[in-house]
Amino acid sequence: MFQAAGAAQATPSHEAKGGGSSSTVQRSKSFSLRAQVKETCAACQKTVYPMERLVADKLIFHSSCFCCKHCHTKLSLGSYAALHGEFYCKPHFQQLFKSKGNYDEGFGRKQHKELWAHKEVDPGTKTA
């Protein structure tokens, strides 16, 4: 008799806990479904899930879609360079876009080799 009374008391208290927690779980699930926004990959236009999400220059990518435009090598956040919304590995970015020419000319100065040419002429006139 003692066991039957204990079992009867345990059942209602357990049901009360279960009923309250299931309604709480349902509310939190419905809230989280409304809060999620589908994000699409800038490269393939497919849905990006949080585990594969990568953001570079305010664009969202799958980690597998974030690759060099020139050689298609997979990029990481520390190994890319961007120009006009296109992404490149650092070696190809330098190869494709580095400035060709002389820095001295770019800043309006005489070329370095011209400065040395004048110094070679001057030592002959120098007196020791």
Swiss-Prot record:
Residues the record lists as N-acetylmethionine modifications: 1
Residues the record lists as binding Zn(2+) 1: 41, 44, 62, 65
Subcellular location as annotated: Cytoplasm; Nucleus
SUPFAM superfamilies reported for this sequence: Glucocorticoid receptor-like (DNA-binding domain) (SSF57716)
Keywords: Acetylation, Cytoplasm, LIM domain, Metal-binding, Nucleus, Zinc
Record-given protein name: LIM domain-containing protein 2
GO CC annotation: actin cytoskeleton; cytoplasm; nucleus; plasma membrane
CDD domains, sorted: LIM_Eplin_like_1
Single biological process term from Gene Ontology: actin filament bundle assembly
Species, as recorded: Bos taurus (Bovine)
Residues in LIM zinc-binding domain copies: 39-99
PANTHER family reported for this sequence: OS06G0237300 PROTEIN
Gene name of this polypeptide: LIMD2
PROSITE patterns reported for this sequence: LIM_DOMAIN_1, LIM_DOMAIN_2
Region (Disordered): 1-25
Function in brief: Acts as an activator of the protein-kinase ILK, thereby regulating cell motility.
